[in-house]
Amino acid sequence: HEKRYSDTILTLSDTYEAGHSLFIVDEKKANDWMLHPDDDLWRGEKGLSNPCPCGYRLHTEKEWRALLSLGYEVKTSPEGFYYLSIADGQLLLPAAGLRNAYTGNFQHIGTRGYYWGANAISRGTSACIDFNKDDITTNISIFGFRAFGRSVRCVKDNQ
């Protein structure tokens, strides 16, 4: 779940409250961490499984697009890691990589960034933003399978 280096388990959850803090490995490639996916879990502050603290929520797809319209660039830190600079450095997103849903392994740490959005697109997928050092284009993707461990960026919920 929310702990970056948590141990793994091979059993998908029956409910949105998994009852443990283990990363659920989706060995059957259902593309979700739940047996019965729920597209409304992260909707705003009052979402059942909102990964953000009280009073905060994830960006919507529309909000991610608005941020990217301010201009962005993939840059390198002095330590050699990559990050996305939006609006001339007003927002920095580290290339934190992701946790592979099918193996539980970490991938692309320091070279690619993967951030969740609040919008469910279809069964097992949600909006997300992806960027990497090799491809200057940064995009909003509809192929964010919810079983993968991606970073979150929480924003104050003014709704």
Q: How should each PLM-predicted stretch be described?
A:
Residues 3-4, 14, 24-159:
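C-terminal, surface-exposed recognition/capping segments
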